[in-house]
Structures are given as structure tokens and as C-alpha cells.
Amino acid sequence: MKKLLLNTLIGLALLTCQTSFAQKTKAKFSPIKVETPARPANQQDVIQLVTPKLETVRVGFIGLGMRGPGAVERWTHIPGTQIVALCDLLPERVENAQKILEKAGLPKAASYAGDEKAWKKLCERDDIDVVYIATDWKHHADMGVYAMEHGKHVAIEVPAAMTLDEIWKLINTSEKTRKHCMQLENCVYDFFELTSLNMAQQGVFGEVLHVEGAYIHNLEDFWPYYWNNWRMDYNQKHRGDVYATHGMGPACQVLNIHRGDRMKTLVAMDTKAVNGPAYIKKSTGKEVKDFQNGDQTTTLIRTENGKTMLIQHNVMTPRPYSRMYQVVGADGYASKYPIEEYCLRPTQVDSNDVPNHEKLNAHGSVSEDVKKALMAKYKDPIHKELEETAKKVGGHGGMDYIMDYRLVYCLRNGLPLDMDVYDLAEWCCMAELTRLSIENGSAPVEVPDFTRGGWNKVQGYRHAFAE
């Protein structure tokens, strides 16, 4: 009897320890939560926002350094536009942009330069519909908010916001003013990525389960050209994936993020910083002991519907350029780097459209002939319309032109834009959320629902077209 009682007590003690340990373990691994501010009264979301048609889209450009002049050049080729104003801190940059207009046979635009607040005067004009912002990162959000407050739609270079506070300001201003706030993410218009998106939408890969994306681009040849060294300075002071949008954009569109699914939790980790401090030592002679941004940052994300994403950032080490675009479906696979390839079950293609379809298998890439046939069949309608012109005009192989053209097209036809302010938020929030994860031992971090309840209102990502 004593032995039975002793065994019972031991069993209860072990059960109590196990329960206590499980409770502690559960508490230990609860995701870090960040605040989601309540939507202000009398304010609605801007999902599928449409605004009155614009016969002519009148634009003003702020920032004419590395990206701005190319945008001005592209807009000279887009019908239904008028370049009204040009702004940069340096007067010579404005003059160089004026020469682009002159070469295109267009009238001179109003000039704003030489004053750090000159951009506000551009935003305050009453003859501009869109303010196109291509400055350094730290000015993006403030300029976007000010432009919307003065009745303008805004198009902001990547990343459009660097903190959650900036993101919420852009969201609330867009919702309050009912103005479009689009991030200028060009990679979603890449020919392979847009074709693969169309294939995913038509079920070629089966249910998409996992996607990958990245910005892998050694910038050692480019660092000297950033105004006042702003980009290296930002990397020196900030940890985390500070430039995630090129990988995030195509990945989120394939997974229908805030169009039937949402990002729920992320975990991030980074390597130590080696090349950043070495570059500063080589270029300035100064020792840097607290360089924040690791040479490589890796992030894993899980969605509400049980899908996963892998995102990388590396601008420091020697590696071939890559956005690491991959789509992993239950019945097929797409990958852009290092070579463009597909892998499909034979059941996923029509024998009338694809040669030698019976030779397809689930463990090897399709042949070049099959790949060409697939890309021809599933070429996106946007590319069917614009590919020839886009490749002539240029801008990262044409995708920059398509990005700008689609912005103008949607505004002229009163359609929802291809990318809304919630896309901007989801792709830019990686900067702060990955830092939070890394600084807390790679702990899970909850991703806010930037739509504040509207992520499931639209089912599936789609481009809008005029009837």
C-alpha cells in the first residue's frame, strides 16, 4: 500500500513538473506583439480604392539623383501624361532633368531646388495629380504624407517606409484622404515573375505552399554614388532586412497576401557584419565597431493559411545578383535564379500546348522547348500589350516602364492600382519586425494586420483592366 501511494505521489509530481514546464515553454515562445492602432473614427479602408478618372495624369517629381532621372525619361514615353514640376536639392540635377524634357520635345517643367523644403511647394501646387518620390529612404514617408494631405496621389520609391510609425502614418493618411499611395516596386513586373504569377493564378503549380525572394546584390561598386553616403550610413545604424521589397513583392502576390491570406508570424536572424566595417575602414580610414547590419539577413514567415516564405538580404558579400524567386506548389515549381526553370507533373499541362508533355516529371526541370511553350501560353496580358515598348524604353529590362505605365493606366481608367498602401506596409514592415526578432534572439514576431480586418475581403490577387 505504501509502495502504491509512493508511486502515485511520484507520478503526480512528474505530471506537475511536465505541466509547469509546458506552461513555461509556451510562455517563453509566445510571439512578440507590436501595437496595431485603432482606425480613426469615420475612416474606412482603401482596399480596391478607385478614384475619378484622370484624362491627363499630371506629375511632379521629387528626387533626381540615382532613380529620378530614369523615371522622368520613362514618363516622356507614356501617353496621357504631363510632367509639371521637377524638384531636387541640387539645382544642376533639375537642369539635367529639364534636358530630358527638351530632348523629348516637351515643354519645360517648373523647377524647385536649392532649399530643403522646396519639395513642399511642389506638393502644394494645384495642377499636379501625382507626386513621384525618388529621394533617400528617410524622406519617403514624410513626403508621401504631406503630398496626400495636399490632395495628391503618391508613388514612392522602395522602401517607402522604414518604421511601423511611418507605415501607419501612410496608411491613415491614404484612408483619410482617399488618395492612392503606391510603392514603386518594379520587380512584380519582371517577365518571368509575372508569367509565373499568371501560371499560379491558373493553377499550373497546384496549391502554392511556399515562396522565396531576396535582394542579393553586392553594392561595393555603387556605395560611392549615394548622396552623402546615405545608404551605407543607414546600414551602419540599422539591423534587420532593410531592403526587402524586391523579394517580398512577387512572393506576396503569389500568396494573395491581404487578398485571402495574411502574414502572421516571422522569425529572422543575421550574420555578423564583416564587409560593411571593412568598406568604411578602406574608404575613410575609420574603425567601426558597432556596424549594425549583418552581411546576410534571413527571414522565415508563416501565413494565416499555413503557407511559408523565405526572404534574404545581402548587399555585402561577393555573390551573383539574385532575387531568389521561387514558387513551390503541390504540383509544380518555378525558379528564376540562377537559371529560369519550371518543374511540373505531366497532369499540369495540356498536351496540345506543350511538346513532349509526357516526358515531364516531378524531379527534373522541363526542357527549353517546354519552358518556351509554357511562357508563351501563360504570358500575362500586361506583357502582351507592353513587352515590345517596354524593352525599347528600358528601365531594368522594361519592368520600370511597365510599373509607371500601369500606374498611369489605372489612374486614367479609374481602376484600383496594382499595388496599394497595404502592400507597401506588408513589404516595408520587414525592416522593423526583423530587427525586433533578431534583437530578441530570433524570437517569433507577429505581423500586424495592416488592413485592420479587411485581409479576407478580396479573394485572390488580380490586375485590373478597363472593359
Swiss-Prot record:
<keyword id="KW-0326">Glycosidase</keyword>
<dbReference type="GO" id="GO:0016798">
    <property type="term" value="F:hydrolase activity, acting on glycosyl bonds"/>
</dbReference>
<dbReference type="InterPro" id="IPR049303">
    <property type="entry name" value="Glyco_hydro_109_C"/>
</dbReference>
<feature type="binding site">
    <location>
        <position position="231"/>
    </location>
    <ligand>
        <name>substrate</name>
    </ligand>
</feature>
<feature type="binding site">
    <location>
        <position position="215"/>
    </location>
    <ligand>
        <name>substrate</name>
    </ligand>
</feature>
<feature type="binding site">
    <location>
        <begin position="157"/>
        <end position="158"/>
    </location>
    <ligand>
        <name>NAD(+)</name>
    </ligand>
</feature>
<feature type="binding site">
    <location>
        <begin position="66"/>
        <end position="67"/>
    </location>
    <ligand>
        <name>NAD(+)</name>
    </ligand>
</feature>
<feature type="signal peptide">
    <location>
        <begin position="1"/>
        <end position="22"/>
    </location>
</feature>
<feature type="binding site">
    <location>
        <position position="88"/>
    </location>
    <ligand>
        <name>NAD(+)</name>
    </ligand>
</feature>
<dbReference type="Pfam" id="PF21252">
    <property type="entry name" value="Glyco_hydro_109_C"/>
</dbReference>
<comment type="similarity">
    <text>Belongs to the Gfo/Idh/MocA family. Glycosyl hydrolase 109 subfamily.</text>
</comment>
<comment type="function">
    <text>Glycosidase.</text>
</comment>
<feature type="binding site">
    <location>
        <begin position="137"/>
        <end position="140"/>
    </location>
    <ligand>
        <name>NAD(+)</name>
    </ligand>
</feature>
<feature type="binding site">
    <location>
        <begin position="243"/>
        <end position="246"/>
    </location>
    <ligand>
        <name>substrate</name>
    </ligand>
</feature>
<dbReference type="InterPro" id="IPR036291">
    <property type="entry name" value="NAD(P)-bd_dom_sf"/>
</dbReference>
<feature type="binding site">
    <location>
        <position position="321"/>
    </location>
    <ligand>
        <name>substrate</name>
    </ligand>
</feature>
<dbReference type="InterPro" id="IPR000683">
    <property type="entry name" value="Gfo/Idh/MocA-like_OxRdtase_N"/>
</dbReference>
<keyword id="KW-0520">NAD</keyword>
<feature type="binding site">
    <location>
        <position position="186"/>
    </location>
    <ligand>
        <name>NAD(+)</name>
    </ligand>
</feature>
<protein>
    <recommendedName>
        <fullName>Glycosyl hydrolase family 109 protein 1</fullName>
        <ecNumber>3.2.1.-</ecNumber>
    </recommendedName>
</protein>
<keyword id="KW-0378">Hydrolase</keyword>
<feature type="binding site">
    <location>
        <position position="243"/>
    </location>
    <ligand>
        <name>NAD(+)</name>
    </ligand>
</feature>
<keyword id="KW-0732">Signal</keyword>
<dbReference type="GO" id="GO:0000166">
    <property type="term" value="F:nucleotide binding"/>
</dbReference>
<dbReference type="InterPro" id="IPR050463">
    <property type="entry name" value="Gfo/Idh/MocA_oxidrdct_glycsds"/>
</dbReference>
<dbReference type="Pfam" id="PF01408">
    <property type="entry name" value="GFO_IDH_MocA"/>
</dbReference>
